[in-house]
Structure formats: structure tokens, C-alpha cells
Amino acid sequence: MLCLTGATAWAGCSDAPASGVDWTECEKNRLVLGGADLTGARMAGAAFDGTDLQGAKMAGADLTHGSVDRARLSGADLSRAKLVQLNGYRATFKGSNLTGADLTKAELFRANLSAANLSRANLRKTELQRANFDGANLDGANLTGADMARANLANARLDGTRLTQTRMFRTRLDGVDLSRSIGLVAGQLDIACGDARTRLPEGIKAPKSWPCGKDE
């Protein structure tokens, strides 16, 4: 596998997957790397579009400015990974461990994060439109300024989740417990999609009628 043009000169783009490997700005698209040990790997700017990374060990890895568009990362360990400004269009993180990961300004449009563990993750100003968080753990996560338009939060956990200025246009909140979330205001709910089972923080009232139905 050759490095991308302009890739960092010392990056070992042809090196085999290994803990701490340097794949900075390398092209690793459409490969099969399921279960690979990439713990602490240096992969800033690297491309993994369409790559199979299911069950990969990527704890503490650096994928800043990287790309995982349509990649499969189900069950991967990305705990404490640096994923700042990561591109992940339609990427699958189902059941992945993203505990404490830094996803600041990442673009995860239509990503599947169902049943993922995002506890204490940093998702500030992250693009999460139409992302699926069904059954995800977002306890203690920071979603300040994130765009969750039309995202699905059904069955997600949001204990201590910071939702300050989070955009929630048509966000699915059916049956979601937001009672211990932080920074939520009534104006965000006026454009969201909840139901009678949606629990809100003390002092915040639900809209008289939620603005959308289950088919939206």
C-alpha cells in the first residue's frame, strides 16, 4: 500500500497493522482490517473509506482529520481516541466503545451509533444529522453546539449529557429520559419529536403538542 501524495515522509504506509503504527495521511480505503490491533496508532489525515474495521482495537489512536466514510467499525474499541474533525458519512459504529473519545467538529452524517458507548465523549459542534443513537450510552457526553437534526435518540441514555445549544430539529426523543441532562431549554424541544414518555429536567415543560409524528 502506497502513501498518499504529500503524506508525511516518515509515515510507514506499507507497515502492517500494529499497536502504535504510524499511518499518518496514508490511504487505507476498502481494506479488511477487522480485529486489527491499532492501539495508539498515529493515523491523522488517514483515509479508511469503506474499510472493514469491525472489532478493531483503536484505543487512544489519533485519527484527527481522518476519513471513515461508509467504513464498518462495529464493536471497535475507540476509547480515548482522538477523532477531531473526522469524516464518517454513513459509517457504522454499532456497539463500539467510544468512551472518552474526542469527536469535536466531526462530521457523522447518517452514521450508525446504535448501542455504542459514548460516555464522557466530546461531541462539541459535531455534525450528527440523521445519525442513529438507538440504545447508545451518552452519559456525561458533551454535545454543546452539535447538530442532531433528525437524529434518532430512542432508548439512548443521557444522564449528565450536556445539550447546551444542541440543535434538535426533528430529533427523535420518543421515550427518552432527559431529566438529568444539562443545558436543555424549552426552545430546543419546540422543534424536536417526543411523546408522552419523554422525561424532561425539572422546570422544563414539554410542548403542548410535539411538532412531528412517528413517520417523520
Where are the regions a protein language model picked out?
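Bacterial N-terminal signal peptides
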Residues: 1-6
